[in-house]
Amino acid sequence: MIPPHRCLTDPLLQGSWPGYLPPMPKRARRMRLTTWRSPVTAVIAALLAAFLTPAAAHGAPRESAPVYSYENAIRESVWVDTRLDGDGDGKTDRVAVDVVRPRELARQGRKIPVIMDASPYYSCCGRGNESQKKTYDANGDVVRMPLFYDNYFVPRGYAFVGVDLAGTNRSDGCVDVGGRSDIQSAKAVIDWLNGRAHGYTSRTGTARAKATWTNGRTGMIGKSWDGTVANGVAATGVKGLKTIVPISAISSWYDYYFAKGAPLYDSGPDWLSDYVDSPDARTKCAAVQRKLVDEAPRTGDWTSLWTERDYVKDASKVRASVFLVHGMQDLNVRAKNFGQWWSALAKNGVERKIWLSQTGHVDPFDFRRTAWVDTLHRWFDHELLGYDNGVDREPTADIERHPDQWVTSTLWPPRGTDAVTLRPGTGTQAGVGTLGLRTGSGTETFTDDPRLSETDWAAHIDESTASKAGFVTAPLAGDVRLSGSSKVTVTATPTTSTAHLSAVLVDLGPDTIRDYADGGEGITTLTDRTCWGASTAGDSACFKNTRATTAAVDYTVLSRGWADLGNHASARKGVPLTPGKAYTITLDLAATDHVVPKGHRLALIVAGTDKDLIDPPSSTPTLTLDLARTSARVPLVGGAAAFTRATAQSGTAADATVLDGVREPHTAHRVPGGGL
């Protein structure tokens, strides 16, 4: 996804920002493929085809091997009937499906599983860190498929399918940004793969194309909008979809654009649709565009458009397993999206696995490449080929604790995690209060200043400033781990009829983190390449390497949330405020997993507009907080007892050179926004 306010020449849009939207036992590392020798491959494939079956003579296989020719793979295009007429031309829409599959297995008549990425980006904007687009030969068959999935998995006996969402590239129809058209575009392809929908050899012809070569077992994968479509398709409960791997994906489109009425971006889904529409769609889809404007009001009120695009409510329908990946500092598809989806899947007993990085909106191929390819390979082998390789018995969560340093968690959140109510209290100076378990009293007052952001507030946490109210623990005597989603309830009295609120949790103390606010959102792209699969002249499996981009910081914003105070009575509808009247509202903070170390302090900051992350209200309110009716519900591993132990006695400050836990912000840590 691209935030609508980003300049299209921004280098972020050239790569990591799409759409302009127990560890395994030690074993020998398999070699990366840097060359491909077709004759040798053919011999190996023939031998294996003759002697190996899914249950080999010496035991069931644990890993698919690269024994099929990628160079000689079948490459074909099919158009699948979605049974919708989104563009209103009187004909049902067909979506383009580009297929790459092993020729040897086709000759043997063996049915194979499918890995599928359904995307709106294949022609407009490209995929991956190098913004790769599909290319075609003179017959219209795909030559280059973006990313490494086909290069790596086709030689291992999978088919790879790249689907152009309706209204994009070579597909009919209109882009409706996560609605029925988007989801049906991909669902129809799974139906076709399972013999329940019609496919054709051309966009307008009548010659049928049947997917007789597949067993219908499908895994969907994708980052951002692509992963969002995977979430949406899984929420239909479609048969044949066995697993999804959503990366930095949306679970409810309302939560991409709004936070309890507060606008996160300065435009709506119509902008995104227009950006990815094909030229044909632009001439036919005015009605769809108008609906995206009219039914997504800038007031932030919930409408039926958002209900249609809320996949969380349908988590009970999910049949597929879910391997979820998200950056905890993703300020594009914000972390609330993965938190609420994960919780809903857990409540419905869905098999699931999660990776949480310190990055922003970045693919794991670009922040943990070797481990990612290995884990994804084993995941698909287990879920689609049925191999008992132990991936389902590994810890549920991998969490990046420091740049390139990962820990695991058997469950996520860990067993013994409880929501603990932390309460603010007044301190020795205005706006600089305490944070603990006891109910506070008194008030704190601040005035919204849209020129300032969460980093400005954190940098001045120990100063009395007009723009925020800060509440801080003493230096901790032991580590405190937050794992999951927090909620902050505030009771505030505004001076105007409109007001926006922000609440952030901050780890105060020096650290080295991935620089998620840098242009690469935590990675730097290098010039050298490594290869992950087989290549052809038109489709290289070799991709630019990356390294972690780090920053030495004096505070880390670890979770954040926002709301329009006018939505105090309903998360779905705002009303004008009465100046001088107190209102209570709860802000949903993003899911995270973060350890506040011994010697650091934990802070809660409540303020108005968070520059670059929400839009300001129409007025400039001053708000007075009633501290007795303000609190934070924070998921702590070990619960209240862990917090009590960590705060029972003063810890030693982590760095004697730090002024009250924060250095002077002469190099302010930037927040991704319009000017970057």
UniProtKB/Swiss-Prot annotation:
It comes from the Bacteria. It catalyses: Hydrolyzes Xaa-Pro-|- bonds to release unblocked, N-terminal dipeptides from substrates including Ala-Pro-|-p-nitroanilide and (sequentially) Tyr-Pro-|-Phe-Pro-|-Gly-Pro-|-Ile. GO terms for molecular function: aminopeptidase activity; dipeptidyl-peptidase activity; serine-type peptidase activity. Its EC number is 3.4.14.11. Keywords: Aminopeptidase, Hydrolase, Protease, Serine protease. Transmembrane segments: none annotated. Disulfide bonds: none annotated. Belongs to the peptidase S15 family. This is Putative Xaa-Pro dipeptidyl-peptidase. The lineage of its organism: Bacteria, Bacillati, Actinomycetota, Actinomycetes, Kitasatosporales.
